[in-house]
A protein has these predicted regions:
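Globin-like tetrapyrrole-binding proteins
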Residues: 11
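Active-site regions of enzymes building and remodeling cell-envelope glycoconjugates
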Residues: 22-25
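Cap/lid and interdomain-hinge subdomains that line or gate substrate/regulatory clefts
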Residues: 2-6, 17-20, 32-44, 53-87, ...
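Active-site-adjacent helix-turn-beta-strand microarchitecture at beta-sheet edges
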Residues: 14
Length: 138
């Protein structure tokens, strides 16, 4: 049976200040990704730090992470170790990040033949006390 693993690509360190009990990767070579996939934690973060890059460089880095993830998952499956990955892209905001560039790359490289069914924009960082609020017009 395939093990579910949540894999979060994070564009910057801001939100990572609130995570615990999981791996935080600052490298994404196949050996490091393999170790993270085989770790007991149900999730891990890959800090891409793409927020500070231009869009073209952010796309290149994201593609490198995705391709290494794909290769690592394929190699593990060939060894009988199957995963049901759930991919999450945690972008700081649509104003400071490279949306939809990074999402498009993730979809192209990890979305399979049909791509992902949907992506969700959630304008909140509950742990940091940030939630988008809409003012009423009353």
């Amino acid at each position: 049976m395939a093990e579910t693993k949540i894999i979060v690509l994070d564009d910057g360190p801001t939100g990572l200040q609130t995570v615990h009990s999981c791996l935080l990767l600052t490298r994404w070579d196949q050996d490091t990704l393999r170790a993270a996939l085989l770790d007991d934690s149900p999730l891990f973060f890959v800090l891409t730090n793409t927020r500070g890059m231009n869009a073209a460089r952010a796309a290149t880095v994201t593609r490198e992470v995705c391709r290494n993830l794909n290769l690592t998952l394929t190699n593990l499956a060939a060894q009988g170790l199957h995963f049901n990955p759930i991919f999450v892209s945690r972008l700081d905001s649509t104003l400071r990040s490279h949306y939809p560039v990074e999402i498009d790359v993730i979809n192209e490289d990890l979305g399979g033949a049909t791509g992902f069914d949907a992506h969700f924009l959630i304008p909140a960082f509950f742990e940091g006390g940030r939630v988008l609020a809409v003012a009423s017009s009353t």
